[in-house]
Amino acid sequence: MSDNTGAPDVQVETTSVFRADLLKEMESGAGAATASGSDVTPPAGAGMLVVKRGPNAGARFLLDRPTTTAGRHPESDIFLDDVTVSRRHAEFRRQDGSFEVVDVGSLNGTYVNREPRNSEVLSSGDEVQIGKFRLVFIEGPRA
């Protein structure tokens, strides 16, 4: 007997998943870059965002440009595909060795450590919320 129901085949996208010990350290507030054997430390002078909660939990985004865009627009550097995210939601800006998140007029706002922010200089371990995505910021060693 055939299992054909007339429904089209569904393609599934996958992302990398972190070790359970690393996720526990991130949730407890410990610096993810200090995890023993951690492979999530970004290169010197760069930063990284790790999706802690959201449809693509575990995905990593390297912040190695002066400006990195995040939003629902397919041309965003960090593409977050969900209706709770504005097309052009936020920018991550690197300047003078530090990183800042700037809300660029989103509908639902950008949060840092669960507080609404128009802009905020980030520290390693900060949690940035864009729509229903929660991303942990990890800062690489100083260049």
Swiss-Prot record:
Residues 68-117 form the FHA domain. The keyword Nucleotidyltransferase does not apply. Residues 29-50 are annotated as: Disordered. Its main location: cytoplasm. Gene3D superfamilies: 2.60.200.20. The modification Phosphothreonine is found at T14. It is found in: Cytoplasm. The keyword Cytoplasm applies. It holds the Pfam family FHA. Keywords: Cytoplasm, Phosphoprotein. GO terms for cellular component: cytoplasm. InterPro entries: Cell_Proc_Reg/RNA_Proc, FHA_dom, OxygluDhInhib_OdhI, SMAD_FHA_dom_sf. Transmembrane segments: none annotated. SMART domains: FHA (SM00240). Residues 29-38 have a biased composition (Low complexity). It comes from the Bacteria. An essential component of the PknG signaling pathway. When unphosphorylated, it inhibits the activity of 2-oxoglutarate dehydrogenase. When phosphorylated it does not inhibit 2-oxoglutarate dehydrogenase. This is Oxoglutarate dehydrogenase inhibitor. The gene is odhI.
